[in-house]
A protein has these predicted regions:
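C-terminal regulatory domains involved in ligand/effector binding and gene-expression control
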Residues: 1-46, 94-101
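Solvent-exposed alpha-helical segments within well-ordered globular domains of core cellular machineries
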Residues: 6-9, 54, 87
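Active-site-proximal loop/helix of nucleotide/amide-processing enzymes and allied scaffolds
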Residues: 49, 68-103
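Phosphate-backbone binding interfaces of nucleic-acid-interacting proteins
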Residues: 63-64
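Short glycine-rich, acidic/polar surface loops and turns
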Residues: 49-58
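Generic secondary-structure microfeatures
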Residues: 28-33, 56, 70-71
């Protein structure tokens, strides 16, 4: 979607965002017929974008783009990284009132 590319262009104006090891993205936009435009991008963090999108679906979040930036600091987090990434997204969505179902 053009709007998602525009959001990423704006975010990439930040040196910090550009320097992130991964900018994991998911979006979910409602359509007039009740279906959704939705997709994700792992940005090299295998399976992370899909997990973010699953969070958006479970939360029934609508008309949102979520980007979680991750900087590799030398410590391998293993599977725990998915919990950290989704928790960051969930906190952001909750602060905006975008959690409409229990996740």
């Amino acid at each position: 979607m053009d709007e998602v590319e525009m959001v990423m262009d704006i975010l990439n104006e930040s040196r910090k965002v550009r320097a992130a090891t991964h900018n994991i993205l998911a979006y979910r936009v409602s359509r007039p017929d009740g279906t959704f435009y939705q997709d994700h991008d792992d940005d090299g963090e295998t399976a992370a974008g899909g997990r973010l999108l699953r969070l958006l679906v479970l939360a029934d979040a609508r008309n949102v783009v979520v980007v979680v930036s991750r900087w590799y600091g030398g410590v391998h987090l293993g599977p725990a990284r998915f919990h950290v990434i989704n928790t960051a997204a969930k906190v952001a969505l909750e602060s905006l009132g975008e959690i409409h179902q229990s996740t």
